[in-house]
Regions:
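N-terminal, charge-rich interaction modules
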Residues: 6-68
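Charged, structured surface patches that assemble and position nucleic-acid processing machinery
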Residues: 31-40, 58, 123-145
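Phosphate-binding glycine-rich loops and adjacent basic patches that engage nucleotide phosphates
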Residues: 44-55, 78-86, 131
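A generic structural signal for short, non-catalytic loop/turn and secondary-structure boundary residues
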Residues: 64, 99, 128-130
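Active-site ExK catalytic segment of metal-dependent nucleases
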Residues: 65-77
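Generic structural hydrophobic/aromatic packing signal, biased to beta-strands
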Residues: 70-71, 106, 135-137
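Amphipathic protein-protein interaction modules
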Residues: 74-126
């Protein structure tokens, strides 16, 4: 099976650090900034991993309690990433479904105020978007690291 890497050229490289593995920070981030209403027991098992497949351009991928799959991207330029949004969302949905997660939340962190409207418009026009697939465009300062 061939692996396809999407958008690696447009993503800033971030060093892994201890805060990414701090369950309390991740729980706060997911609940307060992504609007997740999962019960407390879901947050007892959180893994933060660097992906080597299609999500290699993600800064971090969280797998939370066997229910929630969150891919966090911090692009150098969200416009470069916008061209790959459809493939990334589709890959996230497939990963969610193959691994039995209830939700896929794609997070794009950028300082650009135009990103929310631009990315939301592209996301809303994608075929097959369901109520278990979410896009969050946030400021990098809200990330849990």
């Amino acid at each position: 099976m061939a692996r396809e890497v999407i958008g690696t050229c447009c993503v800033q490289s971030l060093q892994m650090n201890d805060i990414r593995h701090n369950n309390a920070s991740i729980k706060h981030f997911v609940r307060e900034h992504l609007g997740c209403a999962c019960p407390d027991e879901v947050f007892e098992n959180i893994s933060a991993t660097e992906q080597s497949d299609i999500f290699s351009s993600a800064s971090t991928v969280y797998e939370i309690g066997g229910r929630l799959f969150v891919a966090v991207f911090v692009p150098a330029d969200w416009l470069d990433m916008a061209g790959h949004l459809g493939k990334l969302v589709e890959a996230g949905k497939q990963f969610r479904d193959q691994h039995g997660y209830n939700r896929f939340r794609m997070v794009i962190a950028t300082e650009d105020n135009d990103a929310e409207n631009g990315l939301r418009r592209i996301f809303n026009d994608l075929p097959g978007i369901d109520d278990k697939t979410h896009l969050h465009v946030i400021k990098p300062g809200l990330l849990p690291w």
